[in-house]
Amino acid sequence: MINLSTFSSIFIANWKLNGNIEFIKEYFQKLTTNSNNCTVICPPSIYLNHLQTNHKNLFSGAQDVSIYEEGAYTGELSTKMLVDNKIHFCLVGHSERRQYFNEKNETVNLKSNNLIENNIIPVICIGETLEEKEKNLTKDVLQKQVIDCVPNKSYFD
C-alpha cells in the first residue's frame, strides 16, 4: 500500500488513446522526478507493463476498470488484473467515460469501492458538461458527483 502522506504533491498524467512503445522509451529517458512528489502515468492499458520502473515515486495507473471481476466482458480490465500487474492507481468517472459510455455516479462509486477493496487508489474525476456550465449548474453538479462518487470505504482503513 502506498503512503500518500509522504508526498508533497501528486501529479497524474492521462495519456488517453495516445503513445506507443517508442514514445514511452523517449518519455522515460527525459523524465525527471522530484522525490517529494508522486507522479502517476495512466497510459492506454496495453502499455501498462511498459511503465514499470524502479522510481520510488513514479507509478502507473489504469485509465478505467470494470465493475465486474470476471466473465464475458470483452475488453474490460478487472481490479484483480490491475493487482496482478502491480497497478496502484486507477482513474474512474472521467468525463469521456461519462459522455461516450454513459457512465453514471453510481458506477463510479462501485468502481471506487472495488478498487479500495483491492488496495488500489481510485482517482475520482468530476466535472460538468459545457451545457451544465452554461446553465450555471457547476456547483450543484460537482457537489452531487462528490457525494455520489466518493466510496463508502477508505483506502486508509
What do the predicted segments below correspond to?
Residues M1-D157:
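Active-site loop-to-helix "anion-binding N-cap" substructures in soluble metabolic enzymes
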